[in-house]
Amino acid sequence: MILRKLPGKQALICRCVSKTFLSVLDSPCFMERHLRDDHDDGEPPALLTYGVHDVAVFYKLWMCKTMLEESDEAKVLKVDDRHLWNYPCIETQSYFHPISSGGLILTRCNSNSPFVFNPIRKEVMKIPAQGDENAWKQPLGFGYDPKGNTHKIISVWETQEHVLVAEIFSLGDTDTKWRSLDISSSASALPFGHVSFSSSTVTIGGYVYWTATISEGSQGACTCGCRSAETGYRLETKNWTKHMVLYRRHLSGFLTQLSSRGLSSNSSASLIFEGPWQWWIFLPRSV
C-alpha cells in the first residue's frame, strides 16, 4: 500500500531495496494499479499523441520527457522525467504508426531503427536494424507470446524477387539479432501477386492483425498468432511467429481495436474496419 502511494520515480528507486521489492514493483498488477492511482501534476502517466505540421506527422511521447542519450554499450536507455517537451519529435509520413502491447509502445521513424518504450519504468530499448533494405518499408507486428513469456516483433516483407520473407525479434533473448523465419507454407496460401502490408496493426489475445494489399487492390486481413482462427485460411503451425491467417475480404479504411480490457485466452474480440461506406467486423475466436 505504501509503495502504491509513492510517486513513480521514488517507487522505482525502491526496486533496489530487496528482491521482494523488485518482484512487487515489476509485477503487472502493481504497475496497473499505480497507473490507475497516479494523478501527479494532473498529467496522464503515459500518453502517445500526434499533431500535423505542414505535410508531416509528428509524434510526441509525453512519458519520456527528455532527450535520449544513446551509447554503443547501452541496450536499454534510461529516461529522466524532469522536462516534458525536450524529447525530439518523431517525423513520419506513411510508413509506420506506433503500436502498443501490454503497456509497451513500439515506434519507428521511417528507415531508422525501431524503439520500444516502457512508460512505467521510463526505459527505452533500441531494436537492431534489419539487413534487407526493403524491410523497413513494411510495418512491424508487435505482440506478447504467452508460450515464450516475452514480447516479439515480427517483420514480413516482399523481396525484389517477389518472395515473401519474415524475421522475428524477441525482447527477452540474449541474442540481439533478428531471426529468419520459414513462412513458405503461409506464403503459399496468399494469392499470387505483389503484397504490401499496411501500417495499421493491432494485437489482441496473442494475435497480431494487419491489412495487406495484394496486386490489383485486393485486400485482406492477415494475422500472426499463437492460436488458430475459426475463419479464413487456417495454417497448421505451432510457433507464434509462423501462424498466418488470411481473410479474403475487400476492405477499406483503418484497422481499429475496439477494446482489449479484460480479454482472456478464451475470449472473442472484435476488429473493425471503418470504410467510407460501411463497417467490416471480424470476430477471431479460440478453437
UniProtKB/Swiss-Prot annotation:
Mind telling me which Pfam families this protein's record contains? F-box (PF00646)
Top-level taxon of the source organism: Eukaryota
Signal peptide annotation: none
Q: Where is the F-box domain?
A: 1-36
What protein name is recorded for this chain?
A: F-box protein At5g48550
